[in-house]
From Swiss-Prot:
This is Heat shock 70 kDa protein 1. PROSITE patterns: HSP70_1, HSP70_2, HSP70_3. Residues 614-649 are annotated as: Disordered. Gene3D superfamilies: 1.20.1270.10, 3.30.30.30, 3.30.420.40, Actin, Chain A, domain 4 (3.90.640.10), Substrate Binding Domain Of DNAk, Chain A, domain 1 (2.60.34.10). Keywords: ATP-binding, Chaperone, Nucleotide-binding, Stress response. The keyword Nucleotide-binding applies.
C-alpha cells in the first residue's frame, strides 16, 4: 500500500507526518528539525527552501515568506495592501491577482502565491520520500478552518503543482482535535475547544468527541491574524525608538528592517519564558549599532488589543454551538503563538480559571492529525485506533445565490456538517425571461454586494412564460469544503452546472508549465497528468451529456427503443469503467471515448435524419458540455447588470 502523508503548511513553519505501525512519526528535515520554515529564497545560482532560505533572509531581499497570507486573495484586498508594507519582496498586480516578483539567476521572475506554496509542498514531499525510501504521491493537506472556497481551491492547485494527489483538505483545528483525541478513552461525549493561533492565521473550533466520532459543532476565526502581527508591533516600536534615539528613520531601508524583524521574532519567542530580553544589532543603519531591551510587560502592552481580540471568535463558536463555556471539558491550544503567557492567561480567565490542556505539541498537532486522516483515506486498516475514527467537519461560511433586489439567499448555512447537499426551487423574475444568471455568493451579510462572489453561470433556453418556470438550484459541498452548483429547469429538463473554481484567481496551464520548468522537476509528468485529466473529464462530460440527451422527452419519443437501450447500455458501461479506472492513462480514456462515439454517432445521426431538432441537447450541438446556447452568444440571459431570479415562497 502506497504511503500517504499529512502536511501542515503553516504561514511561518511547515510540518509533515506519517502514520504507520500504529503510531505517528513527525519527519525531520535534512537539518534534523521537525518544523521547516515556510521560506523560499532565490539567488544568482540556486533556489533555497526552508532553513537554508530563512538563514539568509537578512542579506537577501529575494527571500519569499508568508505566501499563505496571499493565497486565494485579490491584489486590491486591504489585507494584501497592508502586508506589502512589511514584505522585502515586491508584489505586483497581474489581472487583479497578486504576483510575487523576484530576481532569480539574473532574471526577473513572477510567481503566484500558490506557485510558492507548491515549492514548500514539494520540499515536504521530498523530505518524506527521503525518510521513507520510496515515492510519495498521496497527501492530506490542512488549511485554516476559515479559509473560503477559492482559498481551498488554490490550496488544492498548489498540491497538484507539487506532484501530489490531495486526498482531502481538512481544517487545521479539526486535525489538532484528532491529535488530542486519538488516544483518549474517556467514556461519554466530551466538548473540546481547539484554539489554533499560528504565525498568520487564527481559528477556533468547538467539537464533540465520543467513541472515535469527531463532530465539529462550530468554527470561527481570522485567516489574516497571527504571530506575524505581534512581530509587526515590535518592529514598529523599535523603528520609533531608533528614530527617537538617533534622529534617523530606518523604515525606508529594506535590509535594516529585515534584520530588525529577525531580532524581534527571536525576542518575542524569548519573552514566552523570560521576563525581559535584549536586542543587539551591529551597524543596523548608517553604521549605527542598535542595542536595546524589552520586557514582557511592555510587549503585552504593545499587543494588548490584538491579544484581547482572540477571545471574540471563542465567544462566537460557543454562541453558534449553543454551548455554555462551563460545558467545555477541554481547551486545547495549538500553534506557536499560544505559547505566549498572556494569551494562555486570557483563555484561562475566560473559562473561569480552567487551565488549557498542554498534552500535545502545539507546533506538531496539526500535522499529527493530518497524518492520521491520510492513513484512514489511503485505506490503512491495520490500526484499531484509526479504524474507529469518523470525522464530521462543517462549512465555515454560508453559501447561496443572489435573488431579486440583490438579496443573499443562503442555501447552506455556516456550520452545516459537510459533505452536504441542498436544493431549493426558484422562478424567473421577469415575464417571458428566456434565461437566468445564477450568481453564487459566500458570506453572512444580507446583501450580495457585501459578500464574496464565488462564480456564476447561465441557464438558457427556458420556455417563455410569466413566472412559471421552476428552476431547482442545488448546492453540493464535498468533504474538502469545495462546492458544485447546478441548476435544473424542471419543465423541460434543461440543466447546467458549475464547479466553483474561482477561475480568475487560478493558474493557467501556461503558468503551471512555466513554474514546473523553473523548478526543473517533473515537467513531463505534470503535463501528462494534465492531459490525462482533460481526457478523463472529456469522456465523463460526453457520457453524462449523452445520458441527459436520451432522457429528454423530445428525444425519447422519437428514438428507436432498441437503439435507446443499446446506447443506454454503452453509456452505463462507460460510466462504470470511469468509476473503476480513475487513474487510467490518457490513451485509455480516449479509446473509451472512441468506443462510445462509435455506438452513439450512428444512432444520433439516424435520429436527426428522422427530423429530430438539434436544440434537443445532443452533446456538441450547441454550447459547452452539451447545453445548447448556454454560453456566450446564446439567447438573452438576463445580463450581468441585475438580479434575475427570485425565491418561490
Amino acid at each position: 500500500m502506497a504511503p500517504a502523508i499529512g502536511i501542515d503548511l503553516g504561514t511561518t513553519y511547515s510540518c509533515v507526518g506519517i502514520f504507520r505501525d500504529d503510531r505517528i512519526e513527525i519527519i525531520a528535515n535534512e537539518q534534523g528539525n521537525r518544523n521547516t520554515p515556510s521560506f523560499v529564497a532565490f539567488t544568482d545560482t540556486e533556489r533555497l527552501i526552508g532553513d537554508a532560505a530563512k538563514n539568509q533572509v537578512a542579506m537577501n531581499p529575494q527571500t519569499v515568506f508568508e505566501a499563505k497570507r496571499l493565497i486565494g486573495r485579490k491584489f486590491a484586498d486591504p489585507e494584501v495592501q497592508a502586508d506589502m508594507k512589511h514584505f522585502p519582496f515586491k508584489i505586483t498586480d497581474k489581472g487583479g491577482n497578486p504576483k510575487i516578483q523576484v530576481e532569480f539567476r539574473g532574471e526577473g521572475k513572477h510567481f503566484t502565491p500558490e506557485g510558492i506554496s507548491s515549492m514548500f509542498r514539494r520540499k515536504k514531499r521530498e523530505i518524506a520520500e527521503s525518510y521513507l525510501g520510496g515515492t510519495v504521491n498521496n497527501a492530506v493537506v490542512t488549511v485554516p478552518a476559515y479559509f473560503n472556497d477559492s482559498q481551498r481551491q488554490v490550496t488544492k492547485d498548489a498540491g497538484l503543482i507539487a506532484g501530489l494527489n490531495v486526498l482531502r483538505i481538512i481544517n487545521e483545528p479539526t486535525a489538532a482535535a484528532i491529535a488530542y483525541g486519538l488516544d483518549k478513552k474517556a467514556e461519554g461525549e466530551r466538548n473540546v475547544l481547539i484554539l489554533d493561533l499560528g504565525g498568520g492565521t487564527f481559528d477556533v473550533s468547538l467539537l464533540t468527541i465520543e467513541e472515535g466520532i469527531f463532530e465539529v459543532k462550530s468554527t470561527a476565526g481570522d485567516t489574516h491574524f497571527g504571530g506575524e502581527d505581534f512581530d509587526n508591533r515590535l518592529v514598529n516600536h523599535f523603528v520609533n525608538e531608533f528614530k527617537r534615539k538617533h534622529k534617523k528613520d530606518l523604515s525606508s531601508n529594506a535590509r535594516a528592517l529585515r534584520r530588525l524583524r529577525t531580532a524581534c521574532e527571536r525576542a518575542k519567542r524569548t519573552l514566552s519564558s523570560a521576563a525581559q530580553t535584549s536586542i543587539e544589532i551591529d551597524s543596523l543603519y548608517e553604521g549605527i549599532d542598535f542595542y536595546t531591551s524589552i520586557t514582557r510587560a511592555r510587549f503585552e502592552e504593545l499587543c494588548q488589543d490584538l491579544f484581547r481580540s482572540t477571545m471574540d471568535p471563542v465567544e462566537r463558536v460557543l454562541r453558534d454551538a449553543k454551548i455554555d463555556k462551563s460545558s467545555v471539558h477541554e481547551i486545547v491550544l495549538v500553534g506557536g503563538s499560544t505559547r505566549i503567557p498572556r494569551i494562555q492567561k486570557l483563555v484561562s480567565d475566560f473559562f473561569n480559571g480552567k487551565e488549557p490542556n498542554k498534552s500535545i505539541n502545539p507546533d506538531e498537532a496539526v500535522a499529527y492529525g493530518a497524518a492520521v486522516q491520510a492513513a484512514i483515506l489511503s485505506g490503512d486498516s491495520t490500526s484499531k485506533s484509526t479504524n474507529e475514527i469518523l470525522l464530521l467537519d462543517v462549512a465555515p461560511l454560508s453559501v447561496g445565490i443572489e435573488t431579486a433586489g440583490g438579496v443573499m439567499t443562503p442555501l447552506i448555512k455556516r456550520n452545516t456538517t459537510i459533505p452536504t447537499k441542498k436544493s431549493e426551487t426558484f422562478s424567473t423574475f421577469a415575464d417571458n425571461q428566456p434565461g437566468v444568471l445564477i450568481q453564487v455568493f459566500e458570506g453572512e451579510r444580507a446583501r450580495t454586494k457585501e459578500n464574496n462572489l464565488l462564480g456564476k453561470f447561465e441557464l438558457t433556453g427556458i420556455p417563455p412564460a410569466p413566472g412559471v418556470p421552476q428552476i431547482e438550484v442545488t448546492f453540493d459541498v464535498d468533504a474538502n469544503g469545495i462546492m458544485n452548483v447546478s441548476a435544473l429547469e424542471k419543465g423541460i429538463g434543461k440543466t447546467n452546472k458549475i464547479v466553483i473554481t474561482n477561475d480568475k484567481g487560478r493558474l493557467s496551464k501556461e503558468e503551471i508549465e512555466r513554474m514546473l520548468a523553473e523548478a526543473e522537476k517533473y515537467k513531463a509528468e505534470d503535463e501528462a497528468e494534465a492531459s490525462r485529466i482533460s481526457a478523463k473529464n472529456g469522456l465523463e462530460s460526453y457520457a453524462y451529456s449523452l445520458r441527459n440527451t436520451i432522457s429528454d422527452s423530445k428525444v425519447d419519443e422519437k428514438l428507436d427503443a432498441s437503439d435507446k437501450e443499446k446506447l443506454k447500455t454503452e453509456i452505463d458501461k462507460t460510466v462504470s469503467w470511469l468509476d473503476e479506472n480513475q487513474t487510467a492513462t490518457k490513451e485509455e480514456f480516449e479509446a473509451q471515448q472512441k468506443e462510445l462515439e462509435s455506438v452513439a454517432n450512428p444512432i444520433m445521426m439516424k435520429f436527426y435524419g428522422a427530423g429530430g431538432a438539434p436544440g434537443a441537447g445532443f452533446p456538441g450541438a450547441g454550447g459547452p458540455g452539451g447545453f445548447p446556447g448556454a454560453g456566450v452568444g446564446g439567447a438573452h440571459s438576463g445580463g450581468d447588470d441585475g438580479p434575475t431570479v427570485e425565491e418561490v415562497d
